[in-house]
């Protein structure tokens, strides 16, 4: 089996400069900060609910005038406040999903650095107004909260398509799986960062949790504006298209099923003066028609539903099903993220060695079905539960990270469009936007199934969605597996 050039002796030093490392870190932490603000909202829900409802020791006491003493009581009970907070989650996910489709198109037409910086800074201001300014002014309004969270979802959606596009500009397809697998841990790091920032100041009031998160995110947006290099061409380094077009036959784009014998002419042009011609962004419809985009988008809608359900519901499931303390359940749920980080990195490495993604995904998702069956029958033991949780995260979180990052980059840099059009951000927006719609619908369905049928049927639902993920990419799995076998037979005959 041929090793990708990036793993061969001396290839890493020759291909990657300190600029690559800076881009890796800046994009990693920019998305981590966006995820941190989402996690902050989850961590302060209890405090917000208490602020929006009457205090227990005041229920039997009528304080006059009522307009002053009860102005912050949006809801008569904590249950109604919790329901509204859950509705805000759904509103955010739907607006985020819609925004992903728009942000991808905008990112391919404007400077990615501008779009990402604008999204981070503007989102930070919205978070500040939502959680801090309204509390300082004691202004509480359900319509305002909903409007702000819709805007926040749209602004946060600028993050993922832009950072994936920038990473795709800097890192070629050789080694992209392992690089993106490691890089996609940014969301998990952001969750941890958000929890730490919120818990450090929550004792002073939930508004300060929003203030600290918003301030750090705004500062990150400023750093991105002045420090991020969108592509190697900005500093005179040859683009990855130039390098990738001279790869040998075995290093063709990983989402292509067939390996044509006829070598196509490099699909890029050079102007006089050795400057790359200005490329044109493709339309939304053209991006959808690219091979593999619709298949992976539908597959990701099913898989992200399962992955985000674990993200939102895992601590509640552990507390509700096993009777463990909320703090213990929160700490234990980290093992799912750990499994996802390891899974995304290792599976990306294997797919780089095979130069194919779909067969690796297929095997992982089939094993994910078994891990879901095993985890649904986990005993009331924290150690065993953590182990099964990590295994489940490995086989579900790993493929989810790979589709949203490495595969999206592959899809946006196919030979069909390479060097003649920009599609990376648009394709990433389509894939992640479709996935987010599935995740938004899934949160409601999980709640409905759990209330009426119980947790075991929730796991049956997860198994069904994981099976649908395999079904949607089955043509790609068959095509790439056959191509892999043909290549192996050719190598054996040549030997």
From Swiss-Prot:
It is found in: Endoplasmic reticulum membrane; Lysosome membrane. GO terms for cellular component: endoplasmic reticulum membrane; lysosomal membrane. Pfam families: MFS_1. InterPro entries: MFS, MFS_dom, MFS_trans_sf, Sugar_P_transporter. Its main location: endoplasmic reticulum. Disulfide bonds: none annotated. Glycans are attached at residues 58, 267. One of its GO terms (biological process) is xenobiotic transmembrane transport. The keyword Transmembrane helix applies. Glycosylated. GO terms for molecular function: xenobiotic transmembrane transporter activity. Unlike the other SLC37 members, lacks glucose-6-phosphate antiporter activity. In osteoclasts, forms a transporter complex with ATRAID for nitrogen-containing-bisphophonates (N-BPs) required for releasing N-BP molecules that have trafficked to lysosomes through fluid-phase endocytosis into the cytosol. Belongs to the major facilitator superfamily. Organophosphate:Pi antiporter (OPA) (TC 2.A.1.4) family. This is Sugar phosphate exchanger 3.
